[in-house]
Each structure stands twice: as structure tokens, then as C-alpha cells.
Amino acid sequence: MTARLAVVVSGFPRTSETFAVGELLALARADMLVRVYATKSGDGAAPQPGVAEMLPLLRVLPAGDAAQQAAAMVEDLGDARVDGVHGYFAHRPAEVAALAAGDLGVGFSFSVHALDARKVPAGELADRARAASGVVACNTDVAQHVEVPGAHVHLLPHGVDLARFRPRPHPDSDGHLRVLAVGRLVEKKGFSTLIDAVARLQVPCLLRIAGTGAEHARLAAAIDRHGLNDTVELVGRRSHDELPDDYAWADLVAVPSVVDSGGDRDGLPNVALEAMASGRPTVVSDVAALGAVVRDASSGPVVPPGDAAALAEALTMLAAPSARAELGVAGRRYVEEHFALAVCTRRVVEHLEAMHSGALEPVDA
């Protein structure tokens, strides 16, 4: 009998959490998803493809502490058959999932991504991991962070849609190196370092930064200070449907992530995998799992985080089309082998099915 799960997420839907939609859709299509509970509302942005299919199953829990939200969830489920509860992040969603599972008398599991693991005190996270039926880690960096004696941690990376993000012809050259960066305008994305790097370049360059966030004014001021208003453009939020065209515009994609002043960092940002799937070279920082994946893929240079000079040197190295061609091919081949969405989501579904249906050994990656 197929296991039936209630899943607790954070805000839903959110532009920055495309991976959640793909995995939830896979659970729903496998007839494993009872309901999706969000601990708060989403970001109000244009939803990703597939979100509409999820909306009939979505409930936004009333504001309150974790115990109150868990109680509301249990009441809403009523007599529905639930074989397990999965928290999609290690902080509040996992806490609510654990409490609701206890009330329902079933097991719980949770996923861990990046900042969510660092929002929970180390001792509390370790206890939660040991109490869970299993933990799903989406990259090696965070897997190591949550691996403790007695915990069952499984590395199951998110995938990328290889049909949506595919190689397209490069733009006609106008003599400029076209650089794209995508992400929320927050400190950990390292976009201020990227702007500083572009200011150092001795080759003609056009930089587009796609996203919105609290750092907008600071980044705009940096662009003005460097005299780059004709070189760097903050293009705002891009929908999931617009992103393939953005990658097609670019000669390469920069992912200059840093560890921010609060200790937050990216794990393995979607943009890096989408860029590789699109056949574009990647220039990335050596942060968390990002540098290791790009080195393994041979899809572009890896530079120290926050080092504008090193980033400028890497961009200059890729100014010639001949220097970029093989990197884009290598990146596409790598994501086809390791991050195909259908394969990755199937592994997550099989893992959760095995875990919550009482199989002795959960399916590993």
C-alpha cells in the first residue's frame, strides 16, 4: 500500500524554491500527498509551473507557535489516512511536522537545505535528526552539518528541468562579454563583489542582475559609484518562464555567493544547475557545495568568495568565445548525468515511500 504523507513547508509558493514544487508534484502524482501545510503565506510572485496543480492540497496554517500550528494541522486532517509527516525544512516546518506526527501516532522526516539548518541550535538539530525516521539532505555541505550519531541522513539532490533549461544558440557578438547573475538581492548572493569585479575589467562587458531584495539600493549605489550605469542593469524579478531567455542572452553566468555577516550561505543554488543545463559556463565562489559541484562538472572557474580581483580575472579569462565553448558542453553533460529532474524527484519519492511504508531500508541516492 502506497504511503500517504502530509508535508509541511515554509511560505508557499516562493519564487526562490522551485525545487519544492517539483518534488511536491512528484509526490502528488504518485498519490502519496494528502495535503501541503504552509507555516506562512508565499511571496506573492508569479508562481512556477505546476503550482496551480498543488493549490487544492494547500492549507496555510494560522499564525502561532509550532505547537499551535501542529494542532491546527491535526484538526484539519481529521480522519484522513496519514502514514507519515515530512517537514520540508529543518527549522519551523520540521518542528511542526514532528509535533503533528506525535499527535497522529506516525513517524516524521524532514529535508535540510542550507540556512534552515543554521537557524536551529546545534543540539536541537541533532536531537531532531535522531528522532526522525530519516533526513533528506540536498547537498554534501548540509549533509555533513546534520550528520550526527544515530541519525539517518540521505543525500538526495534537487534536480533541474532539462527540457525547460536547454542549450540555445549564443547571442550574436557585439564585442561585449554578456554576464548574467540571478538571485535575491541579499548579502549572501555576493552581487556587490560581482559589481566590484566588473568595475575592474579591461574588456567590454554587460552585466544583468535579475532579482529583487533588500540590497537593491546598495547595489544601485555601487553601480553609480563605479560609473557602470551603462554596463550593469538591475532587471528585477524574473518569472520562471522568462529565465530560459535570460540564460540564452548570456555568454556566461556568475554565481558569486559569500557567507554573509549572519553566517548564512547558499548550499547549491538552482541558478548554477540551470546555467549548466542551458549550456552556459559558470563562474562561481567556493562556498558550501557550489565550488565542489562546478569543479566536478568542469563547467567554469571557481574563485574565493568575496574576492573581486579573482572574480575579475576569471571573467576576463572567459571573454574569448573559444575559452567558453567546452565549459558549456561539460556543464550540460554533468547535469544530464547527475541532476536530471525526473531522476532526482523519483529518488525523493522512492525514499519517502520506503521510509514511511515501513520498509527496512530507505532507498538511498
Say what each PLM segment does.
Residues 1-60, 364:
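N-terminal subdomain of nucleotide-sugar transferases
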Residues 18, 22, 177, 181-200, ...:
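A conserved mid-protein helix/loop that constitutes part of the nucleotide-sugar donor-binding site
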Residues 120-123, 160-176:
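Acidic anion/phosphate-binding donor-loop and adjacent secondary structure
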Residues 141, 159:
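Carbohydrate-associated surface elements
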Residues 220-242:
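Nucleotide-activated donor-binding/catalytic signature segment of Leloir-type glycosyltransferases, i.e.
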Residues 231, 317, 323-344:
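A short, well-ordered alpha-helix in the C-terminal region of glycosyltransferases
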Residues 272, 277, 281-284:
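Short hydrophobic beta-strand element within catalytic cores of glycosyltransferases
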Residues 296-297, 301-308, 317-322:
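Conserved acidic donor-binding segment of nucleotide-sugar-dependent glycosyltransferases
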